Amino acid sequence: MIQVTGNLYVETGMTACNLGFVATKAGVVMIDTPMKPTDAVKWRAEAAGKGEIRYLINTEEHPDHWQTSHFFPGTLITSRETRDKLKEVPAARVLETVKHMDPEGVSFMEGYRVRLADITFADSMDLYLGDHTISLFRLPGHSAGGIGVYIPEERAVFTTDIVFQKKKSWLHESLPDQWLASLKKLSELDAEVVVPGHGELCKKDYLKEQAGIVEQWVEAVKSAIKKGWSIEEAEERIASPDPYPKQPGTPMTEPELNKAIVARLYQLYA
């Protein structure tokens, strides 16, 4: 765990997304949860050591952001889209995932349920706790339900998976125009610290590089379509323009992810 600012703590070493919390005078606000129950128990203890856990925020609908929310106290906040998506996820599917990736965590799974948000919002909302403002706002593009979390008093923003800092970007469900618009929104914030969905903490200057990766993927697929390649040909022939490796411990092989990205973009632009 890293103490990033006076009241902001971040964990970048658990599977799979980055985690954080703000320790306010009136309690703790947590951002995202680990995938492994064994990690969740440790992370819960870290946060509870700084105060009562009052709120938990899941920044999108992919399981690396919400899978262990069941193990955390506090009022849960997500976007409407994320809550709607999670209503469709059976607890049995999560149990099978845990058996595979965290065998020691199976003992924690008795009574497990996929936790749904207590509060949702459509576009943005502000939470006031102690001396802190927690501003939540929609950040679609990587996923339908993505949201950002901005803490102006700490000059920090959690970007969900709109930013992969020097990790391979997952565009397998992307809407690139929305992704680029979300990056522009992030660039306009007064933030000194950028907490990406994956990778190490960075500054706002990385947003330009992230936008370039999205744009290069789109250009590569549009070029293949213009040449008359079939989707199968595009999947086989397009080399990834992303210079960074896939994060270890995440699903799919790198070739499988490349094909999934090409297929998604081909369907959008063909």
Regions found by a protein language model. Name each.
Residues 42-44, 68-71, 89-91, 171, ...:
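Short amphipathic alpha-helical segments
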Residues 1-45, 148-160:
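Conserved beta-strand hairpin/beta-sheet module of binuclear metal-dependent hydrolase folds
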